[in-house]
Amino acid sequence: MTIITPITNDPTTALLRLMAWLSPVFPAGSFSYSHGLERAVHDGLVVDAAGLQDWLQWLVRRGSGWNDAVLCAESWRCAMKGEDLHEIAELAEALAGSRERHMETMLQGGAFLAAARSWPCEIFDRLPPDCAYPVAVGAVAGGHGVPLAQALAAFLQAFCINLLQASIRLSVTGQSGVTAIMAALEPVLGETAARAALSSMEDLGSATFIADIMAMKHETQHSRLFRS
């Protein structure tokens, strides 16, 4: 029996779906990736809560977090308009700057789509079988009619929370430090989500070269906790 999950116009339903899809317990495997943070800690570039907050805010404002938000927004629009998603999926995959970043986004995207099928939607038939994580999240949110601004804010917060969880395991800070950073990042996340909601593909671009290099260097790190 096929169960059709309708597009939601109810803000509470939209919120519940976002909280489920982007929860740390949603089986996308996010807990196993550090996005290069593990190498940054290893090399002494991130040593405390202040440095971690700075690292995260620039990833969100001008780094991979920003690019992923732009890709997420464009995927949402394609889903809402019934447009083809293969081109944006190919671009998102190509933008992965290293082997482990590519693995991180593709495996998370595939796992996200597999788990999100618990909320049936025709969008799954329009997506390629292998799909980068921001494209998967944006397309599924758009397919279910979840508002774009809320989807982007939740997506960016989930990105930061995953790295904050990694920072605890890496002994950069503790739970009190993490909660303080979460509170401090709220304006950054809100502002970046608002910019991304108005963005186009011409707004893609990042300037966090050290973070990208750390992701590359992690590939040869001998002792590690994370896959990226």
UniProtKB/Swiss-Prot annotation:
Q: Which family does it belong to?
A: Belongs to the UreF family.
Q: What's the name of the protein?
A: Urease accessory protein UreF
Its assembly, as annotated, is: UreD, UreF and UreG form a complex that acts as a GTP-hydrolysis-dependent molecular chaperone, activating the urease apoprotein by helping to assemble the nickel containing metallocenter of UreC. The UreE protein probably delivers the nickel.
Instruction: State the protein's purpose.
Output: Required for maturation of urease via the functional incorporation of the urease nickel metallocenter.
Q: Which UniProt keywords apply?
A: Chaperone, Cytoplasm, Nickel insertion
Gene Ontology cellular component annotations, sorted alphabetically: cytoplasm
PANTHER family for this protein = UREASE ACCESSORY PROTEIN F
Coiled-coil stretches noted in the UniProt entry, renumbered to this chain = none
Its annotated compartments are: Cytoplasm
Q: Which InterPro entries match?
A: UreF, UreF_sf
One of this protein's Pfam families, by short name?
UreF
HAMAP family according to UniProt: UreF (MF_01385)
Does this entry carry the keyword Acetylation?
A: no
For this chain, one GO molecular function annotation is: nickel cation binding
